[in-house]
Amino acid sequence: MKLFVLIALFGLGFAQHNPNTRDGRTAIVHLFEWRWADIAAECERFLGPKGFAGVQISPPNEHILVSSPWRPWWQRYQPISYNLCSRSGGENELRDMITRCNNVGVNVYVDAVINHMCGAGGGEGTHSSCGSWFNANNKDFPSVPYSNLDFNDGKCKTGSGNIENYGDPYQVRDCRLVGLLDLALEKDYVRGKVADFMNKLIDMGVAGFRVDACKHMWPGDLDNVYRRLNNLNTKWFPGGSRPFIFQEVIDLGGEPITTGEYVGLGRVTEFKYGARLGELFRKWNGQKLSYTKNWGEGWGFMADGNAVVFTDNHDNQRGHGAGGASILTFWDPRLYKMAVGYMLAHPYGFTRVMSSYSWDRNFVNGKDENDWIGPPSNGDGSTKPVPINPDQTCGDGWVCEHRWRQIMNMVQFRNVVNGQPHANWWDNGNNQVAFGRGNRGFIVFNNDDWALDVTLNTGLPGGTYCDVISGNKDGGSCTGKQITVGGDGRAHFYINNSEEDPFIAIHADSKL
């Protein structure tokens, strides 16, 4: 019996590590703060045809409306209820988007905020995205309903009621994260309300969840909630499929709470990945790309099958969260494209690409005073649509990194080489490196201050290939560089260090 229970335990967690992607698709994109109507259109016109596996959406539940500062992005992370009406749209628009994305093979992953409700200073009234009344002062949220009995205040031992010391795991789990009212997830009633919210989304067709702030919840409480979740909707997924769970746990080392406590329940965000990747491409702290021959677990990251990896996310591109100044973002486009290219070419982890909006940064003593600014919006605070320009970029302040040719084409590269081993490594001892993926793909980087000029074994069949970084394969022709691979698998590469994009990628489907 014990053995059976162990297998059942392990089996459930293991199933929750599976992203349930379709048709050999391998990378998801976070369309941060996009409206549901725009995501639905993007699935149909771009994400589906271009081979993206899925989209991570911003929290869909009712949230507080903050006036000072004006409608910041982080108001989405302060729930008022589990009603499905948010800054991105209402329940009907959400359902329509989930259906339309699923119909073109693109999964939807929900950012689930279940650790807390709004901030203790959230006040009383109907300043919420659906107009529900609430009173944060006495912890009254009748639209759930939650009352003061459903929060952790009695368990928290700090004077302020907030987390004061990250060295104390009890504080981190039982006290308020930056003043946010901390739900008592040990209570059966609260667990039930959270599971009902998640199950409604599963029944609508979502494929899984990014679970926010998991470090601040006890693993046993999360396990209980996950066990209550329904299997995925069989209209789009095989019978018995479990929701994909990936948990936000910031663990850069140095704290008692580690990712290891959560990997049995689902995948976990590997924040070390983007922090190290940024250092490597910036060449900080003596780092060199030549040191990445054993990139992945060899660098002290969690096991491959447990990791969700990303260059940047919505927090750390603003200096919040983890990684500090080393994090590469769209503000550093040349290095950013290389770093994302490296991530998408390398077999380690399940990959997430960021899609951002720009804002007017204002650095004072190294801190961006405008890191709160919400998405492009109208005077009334409503989020603007995402317009697509004739050149396929986005307008109105939406950055759309996922549409940049170099990133879009590397998502396709990852699909083409899926399942192939890391092979044919080469480096120059500095910041020129190359590696292949079996006999399906090969990529070369020059991050040195001098030209790369070398003949390498690619492992690819002989022929002429289109470099998908400098251009696109268009029928039988190529709009970028062409690379000739000999019958022996060898090819000559030249990359000047002054090029806009000093890297080259070729793969089986880019053969002319």
From Swiss-Prot:
Name the EC number(s). 3.2.1.1
Which residue positions does the secretion signal occupy?
1-15
The cross-references to Gene3D superfamilies, in alphabetical order and at most eight, read: Glycosidases, Golgi alpha-mannosidase II
Query: Which cysteines are disulphide-bonded?
Result: C43-C101, C85-C130, C156-C175, C394-C400, C466-C478
The record's annotation in InterPro entries points to: A-amylase/branching_C (IPR006048), A-amylase_C (IPR031319), Alpha_amylase (IPR006046), Glyco_hydro_13_cat_dom (IPR006047), Glyco_hydro_b (IPR013780), Glycoside_hydrolase_SF (IPR017853)
**Which residues of this UniProt protein bind chloride?**
R210, R352
Key words of the record:
Calcium, Carbohydrate metabolism, Chloride, Disulfide bond, Glycoprotein, Glycosidase, Hydrolase, Metal-binding, Secreted, Signal
SMART domains in alphabetical order: Aamy, Aamy_C
Q: Name one GO biological process term.
A: carbohydrate metabolic process
Q: How does the cofactor attach, per the note?
A: Binds 1 Ca(2+) ion per subunit.
For activity, the cofactor(s) needed are: Ca(2+); chloride
Known catalysed reaction(s)? Endohydrolysis of (1->4)-alpha-D-glucosidic linkages in polysaccharides containing three or more (1->4)-alpha-linked D-glucose units
Where is the protein situated, by its record's location annotation?
A: Secreted
Q: Where does Ca(2+) bind?
A: N115, R173, D182, H216
Q: Which GO terms describe its cellular component?
A: extracellular space
Cite the GO molecular-function annotations of the record. alpha-amylase activity; metal ion binding
Per the record's keyword annotation, is Ribonucleoprotein included, yes or no? Answer: no
Question: How is activity tied to temperature here?
Answer: Optimum temperature is 50 degrees Celsius.
Q: Which residues form the active site?
A: D212, E248
Glycan-modified residues: N496
Recorded effect of pH on activity = Optimum pH is 7.1.
A Pfam family annotated for this chain is: Alpha-amylase
Family in the record: Belongs to the glycosyl hydrolase 13 family.
- Tell me, in a sentence or two, what this protein's role is: Catalyzes the hydrolysis of alpha-1,4 glycosidic linkages in starch, glycogen and similar oligosaccharides.
- Descriptive protein name: Alpha-amylase
> Mind giving the lineage of the organism this protein is from?
Eukaryota, Metazoa, Chordata, Craniata, Vertebrata
